[in-house]
């Protein structure tokens, strides 16, 4: 019954001191209110209250040793009460005689239940205070060191913060988008002009053709030219079967590889056709020169026409009409592409 009442009071009020004074009232009722016998005095004097101020390990070992001794004395008539007294020895300071060996100068400790109740809060307060002081001290030291170390700049508050990576993006992105749109519009406006201006000037297109055909050796081009002129001089190629490509720009931009040129020349030989005003002019000129019925005179006339007559006629045409220069070059390019 007593234990249940103590438990209930302890649960209802954890700071209640009646639980600690239950043993004291039992001892007072058993031993009497005023006189103590020698046995109780000797037992109370044998308790070493000085060991309570030592470390936790020594205090724990002394408590276990005392618990073992109390178990051995359990058969005595007052051993039960002595074991109960041991749970709260700080309330028995009035029973200790004046001639006892307890000469400690330490103050009387509060009740153990109150210590158990306040220990967590005390430790929490101490830990918070220590951490707060340490954090403040570290912050003060770090601020002092930071002031000494940081560079002298106008934006010292933003030192070490990468705001230029994230914070400024929303301000810069709109301007970048507007610039990109402006660039796209300018490109769209300039591209039709260039596309219109390219077919208008035949000289520019011929320059592009010359730049594309510059990769081939001049000897190969001269051989092709000589072969075509020989065919024209013999009259094996007529200019009436194949239409010209003077207006088709895609025809000039076709890839001109040696294999393609060889294939095209073979097709021309098989079809017996050519397409160029200059070739027709050269054909008529060579026919006018070739009048001899002998093969030797034909060969000599072809050689002379290949080596001397064509450059001479082109020079004469360029000297008479400079505007015909681009047309002649364009016709030569079309003949080579075929």
Curated annotation (Swiss-Prot):
Keywords: Phosphoprotein. Residues 307-316 have a biased composition (Polar residues). Residues 50-75, 267-318 are annotated as: Disordered. It comes from the Eukaryota. Residues 50-70, 267-306 have a biased composition (Low complexity). InterPro entries: Mbr1. The modification Phosphoserine is found at residue 119. This is Increasing suppression factor 1. It comes from Saccharomyces cerevisiae (strain RM11-1a) (Baker's yeast).
């Amino acid at each position: 019954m007593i234990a249940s009442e103590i438990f209930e009071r302890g649960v209802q009020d954890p700071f209640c001191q009646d639980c600690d004074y239950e043993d004291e009232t039992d001892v007072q009722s058993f031993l009497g209110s005023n006189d103590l016998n020698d046995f109780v005095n000797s037992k109370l004097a044998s308790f070493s209250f000085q060991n309570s101020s030592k470390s936790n390990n020594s205090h724990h070992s002394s408590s276990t040793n005392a618990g073992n001794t109390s178990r051995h004395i359990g058969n005595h008539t007052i051993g039960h009460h002595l074991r109960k007294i041991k749970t709260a020895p700080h309330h028995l300071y009035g029973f200790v005689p004046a001639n006892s060996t307890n000469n400690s100068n330490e103050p009387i400790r509060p009740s153990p239940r109150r210590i158990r109740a306040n220990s967590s809060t005390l430790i929490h307060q101490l830990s918070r205070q220590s951490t707060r002081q340490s954090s403040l001290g570290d912050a003060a030291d770090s601020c002092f060191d930071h002031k000494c170390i940081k560079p002298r700049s106008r934006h010292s508050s933003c030192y070490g913060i990468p705001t230029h990576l994230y914070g400024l993006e929303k301000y810069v992105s709109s301007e970048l988008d507007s610039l990109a749109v402006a660039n796209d519009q300018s490109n769209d406006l300039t591209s039709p002009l260039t596309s219109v201006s390219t077919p208008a000037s035949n000289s520019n297109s011929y320059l592009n053709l010359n730049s594309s055909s510059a990769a081939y050796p001049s000897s190969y081009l001269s051989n092709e030219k000589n072969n075509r002129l020989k065919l024209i001089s013999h009259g094996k190629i007529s200019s009436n079967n194949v239409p010209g490509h003077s207006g088709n720009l895609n025809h000039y931009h076709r890839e001109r590889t040696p294999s393609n040129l060889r294939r095209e020349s073979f097709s021309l030989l098989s079809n017996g056709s050519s397409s160029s005003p200059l070739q027709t002019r050269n054909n008529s000129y060579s026919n006018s020169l070739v009048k001899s019925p002998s093969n030797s005179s034909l060969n000599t006339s072809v050689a002379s026409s290949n080596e001397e007559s064509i450059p001479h006629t082109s020079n004469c045409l360029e000297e008479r009409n400079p505007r015909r220069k681009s047309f002649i070059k364009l016709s030569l390019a079309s003949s080579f592409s075929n």
